[in-house]
Amino acid sequence: MRYMATYDLMETLRNTNQWLGATAAALGSYPATALAPNPFFQMMAAWGDVTERTFHRMTVKPDWGINTVVTKDGRERLVEVEKLVERPFGDLIKFNAVGRAPRERRILLVAPMSGHYATLLRSTVNSLLPEADVYVTDWHNARDIPVSEGKFDIEDYTLYLVDFMRHLGPDINVIAVCQPAPLTLAATAYLAELDPEAQPQTLTLIGGPIDPDAAATDVTDFGRRVTMGQLEEMAIQRVGFKYSGAGRMVYPGLLQLAGFMSMNAEMHSKAFADQIMRVTKGEASDHDKHNTFYDEYLAVMDMTAEFYLSTVERLFKDSEVARNAFVVNGHKIDIGKVTDVAVKTVEGSKDDITAPGQCVAALDLLTGLPEEKKASHLEPGAGHYGIFAGKSWRNNIRPMVLDFIDQNAGTHAKQAEKKRAEKAKAKTAPAAAKAKAEPSSSDEGGLPTRIPV
């Protein structure tokens, strides 16, 4: 079948490299090699160890690894991950701190669907969990979704976000990280028009390409240079028979990873060379800085072909969100209809993926939003990863975002309480009606309960 051979070829190459690494590690670790007065075998074993781990991580979904959290009362509590909404292409999950009362701050982290799993936001979740109830969009690997589940493009993605926001209520504070920023803005505008009472309380857009033409990067240059026909021929493949999604057209995560690494090839090459030397000297460990970062960075997932292609064509080439011309399910969204959601943008001055200017463009589109509900921040010296997971996030951006949420807490909380009360009433009403409708023992069949004496 067309494109399936190339998908299986990539998987074969990955598998072969993993096997070569394991073989080299085994050969270099034989006790007899210690007799050779030469570090060659030690270096071969180290190369094999690093290579095997690297190629193995590419197909493994990482665990969240968030087992406990220290709350404000100083107690360490267990953390459980609960699925609130389950869908074929992604779930809405909540991190429950066992025994902790619900927090006033409720935060929905919209994870990017750009080749990595939602666990890329692990440190972000960790930093917010002591301060808030945290919810995350957990997107699924397209290779594991049967073709029978249908398509999933940027319109479907937007409608998923709309449903998740509706489920969580109007006192939710949404933080969109990178890729989903324009679609999260569109979802908020969709609710502003069609279901105003379900709008989130605040919306924070972190390093998202709202207007890709505002500042050029390698990503935007690639989008302009390549035609959609070329992109479909070069990037789209069909999932092989090894996975549940056999036959589904996807943009493979391995291709996305290759693109990411080529942008900083010299840095990655040095990082792996240094790690091989550390393993040789016995200085490396399972959870050292290199392995902690690359175990997550190398774990990639496939995206549906229609999602990837529609992202490039409609968001980058046609700039539909930037032009306020985005259409969802036949409905043209007007971002100017957002009037009651406080919006903040965050950018990094050294972001080479979403350059400064691309994200802050969202504020110009919000023509119906009062100026006092708009805010922006440019973090000096921060790169793309740093603005949501690095030192800049922990020390500067996180406290600023939490303050922004607190400053804009208010009427939405009252709306949320009202909606929850209505939901609870709706749940109890059928049970009460059923109990009322059931005949009592005194009128069963119209017969008396006692025989008169």
Labelled PLM ranges:
Residues 1-43, 47-48, 170, 187-306:
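Alpha/beta-hydrolase-fold enzymes
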Residues 1-75, 418-453:
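N-terminal targeting or regulatory segments adjacent to alpha/beta-hydrolase or S9 domains
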Residues 67-145:
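Short, surface-exposed "cap/lid" segments of acyl-processing enzymes
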Residues 144-146, 156-173, 185-189:
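Conserved acidic catalytic loop of the alpha/beta-hydrolase fold
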Residues 176-184:
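Gly/Ala-rich beta-loop-alpha elbow adjacent to hydrolase catalytic centers
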Residues 338-339, 345-347, 351:
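Short beta-strand/loop motif that positions the catalytic acidic residue
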Residues 352-358:
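Conserved alpha/beta-hydrolase "acid-adjacent" motif
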Residues 377-396:
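Catalytic histidine-centered segment of alpha/beta-hydrolase-like enzymes
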